[in-house]
């Protein structure tokens, strides 16, 4: 009897071990990624993921043209098909500013403020099986996970892996950097051809994992159908390690590229020049003034001071600048500041 019981228990234990191995093989990288989430400062968290980032599967489906569809795909990927939810994303407008400069020794730096009515930022450091290593940021409130949601506790941390599919800004190991900013009006872009569909924020993740420089990024943008997030117009600030800096805008569903080191929340292209520029908003002018004063040459401290000077304070109904990034494109790395806490830098490097 004891021998039979021992055999049964060993058999059950063997099945449990096999089941555990199968679960780990399927979910291991995701579980490890979720457990990596740590709080850096008020309103800012960091997590790291290594493995299949889900983008090959997304593109194989032809992409998605809405944030809700993309969010549902993200949750399905995280559950490995065992859960298929209906997700409703939030639609709030946001501000922002960006500036790219050179250093005295020929390097390239890019600064960026993300301004939003409310936000909790999660830094996603992704080392994908296929593609470039990236460090990106997203606002978890974008997905509408619920009031007072924070990336704390395993369940919430796991949900934050949706950030694999969306980014508001970021840099890759090749020194390509991109930031998404509101463009100044509510005219949406919805390109509908036979190309794969991506939303504004999904395209950032896709480009950073597949493009080494601005030229390659523009080719990738031309290879997809762009769809506006949050029911509004967007434009990209995009720079690379060579020093090329462009603004990508969309007019009548056509991509327009403008060479510019600075950007805020109004159009720069000739077709809609200054649309969205409001009285009293001098952030863009102040950035351009600093470029002229310095001839576009600054060190990291000077760029940080410059981008901090156009950050936005909190006011009623508006959080202000949720996070600031200062990126080194020549030696790919990024320093974050949360909620204008410019005395509390958080530095991360790529190419590990």
Regions found by a protein language model. Give the residues of each.
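N-terminal mature-domain region immediately after signal-peptide cleavage
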Residues: 5-205, 209, 298-352
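Structured loops at beta-to-helix junctions and adjacent beta-edge loops in soluble globular domains
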Residues: 113, 174, 181-183, 239-241, ...
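A short secondary-structure junction signal
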Residues: 122, 189-192, 219, 247-251, ...
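Phosphate-interacting basic helix/loop segments used at nucleotide- and nucleic-acid interfaces
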Residues: 220, 228-229
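Extended amphipathic alpha-helical segments with heptad-repeat/coiled-coil character used for oligomerization
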Residues: 231-272, 278
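Charge-rich, low-complexity intrinsically disordered segments
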Residues: 263-306
